Amino acid sequence: MRRLLALLLLWSTNSMADQPVLRFSVAESWSMPLVRIEDDQPVEGLLHDLMQAVAREVGVRPEFHVMARLRLEEAMSSGDIDVRCYVSTQWLNDRPRDFVWSIPLIHQRDVLVGRAGDSTPIPPERLPPQAIGTVLGYTYSTLQPLLDHGQLHREDSRSQLLVLQKLQAGRYRHAVSNQLSLQWFNQGLPAEQQLQALAVLDEQDLGCMVRNDPAIPTQGLLRALVRMKQSGQIERIVRRYGGTGDPDSMSVARPEIPSKMPAHSQRN
């Protein structure tokens, strides 16, 4: 029996070694429910499960490259990664010509978040001059006019989790978060301590970009993502980590810049 188990283990190890490798990028700014990173490798989370699932679909071995978000486009251009997931066309300065887009896979909302008990909806242009919690390297197109005019001032953290933790601790009065991360952060808190979504700032359909290279199964991977989306597998992964689709009916805020704007922002 032991010999049989040893042979099965050896066969499994050799089979994995024979599989082609596909290099997936992982942004170090991601936190749960997107991904949890241990020893510079993702070990669980929505995107970890999605990337593992699509790798199984096409019979490749995933290799995860954790890097700063600001390095992702450089890594794509230099050929250091094969697949980048959880990305929007709005986030790229220049689209790498040798990458192909998948179909939209996940719908994301960015929301303005207030402290516990601060549940009154407020459009961002009505915020008084203040620092606002943001993630280092992330762009917030809806808020950019307010940042440019000095009404708001970025208070950057390295991850979305740190942004929400600092808001909870009172470092600032408002922050920006994607809806999934906010729901995950709140799920273990009593209702009176939960952070509040005050306005939807933006919505994006996110997908994956795959290197168009004959050395990797580009079209097979794109077709696998289509099958996973059509079968409901991706939605099941999202729900596994607390995603509820469309949690409320708040409309997307489009700030109007007042004619007179304070010249400088002020910190809390």
Language model segments and positions:
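Alpha-to-beta junction loops
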Residues: 60, 77-86, 168-177, 181
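Short helix-initiation/N-cap motifs at beta->coil->alpha
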Residues: 63-74, 155-165, 169
